[in-house]
Amino acid sequence: MDSIFKDAEQKMKKALSSLKSELASLRAGRANPSILEGINVDYYGMATPLNQLANISAPEPRLLVVQPYDKSAIEDIEKAILKSDVGLTPNNDGQVIRLAVPQLTEERRNELVKIVRQKGEDTKVVVRNVRRDANDELKKLEKEKEISEDESIRGQDEIQKITDKYIKKIDEVMNAKEEEITSF
């Protein structure tokens, strides 16, 4: 039974971690290097992740600075940022690329809050599906007489506690991101 609990918790933890990384890439009006995650640069004919070609920092709340390790790649990096859907316009001075992060409009904030809620709800569905699968496994063990009915019920209660813990964590992550979006 312990393996069922561990497996369920592991899957729920993975779902929460996935939600956190998805939400980190949502632009909330302040400069965050994770905005540029997932951008690949055509570097000598190979698609290379931007963070392997440059140092990305946020020296000010509304400014990202991309400092290429190889200055000859600056044009390629600029093109990759323009082609991506981050919605930022690069300003290239030959040494570094500066990206000014504009203030979010009220409409865009509301749109982002909806996206956050949708991603959160999708993650809750994943967690609930994990709970269902774990409970089904416990019922199967009970049916095969490997565990008693009492053990099955205790196991389902334990699975519910784990589920509640992760649903609460998902809500906390969603609320923090919504706060970040609406407070700027």
Swiss-Prot record:
SUPFAM superfamilies (UniProt xref): Ribosome recycling factor, RRF
GO MF annotation list: ribosomal large subunit binding
Domain of life: Bacteria
Annotated keywords: Cytoplasm, Protein biosynthesis
Function according to Swiss-Prot or TrEMBL: Responsible for the release of ribosomes from messenger RNA at the termination of protein biosynthesis. May increase the efficiency of translation by recycling ribosomes from one round of translation to another.
Family: Belongs to the RRF family.
UniProt xrefs under PANTHER family: MITOCHONDRIAL RIBOSOME RECYCLING FACTOR PSEUDO 1, RIBOSOME RECYCLING FACTOR
Protein name in the entry: Ribosome-recycling factor
Organism, scientific name: Natranaerobius thermophilus (strain ATCC BAA-1301 / DSM 18059 / JW/NM-WN-LF)
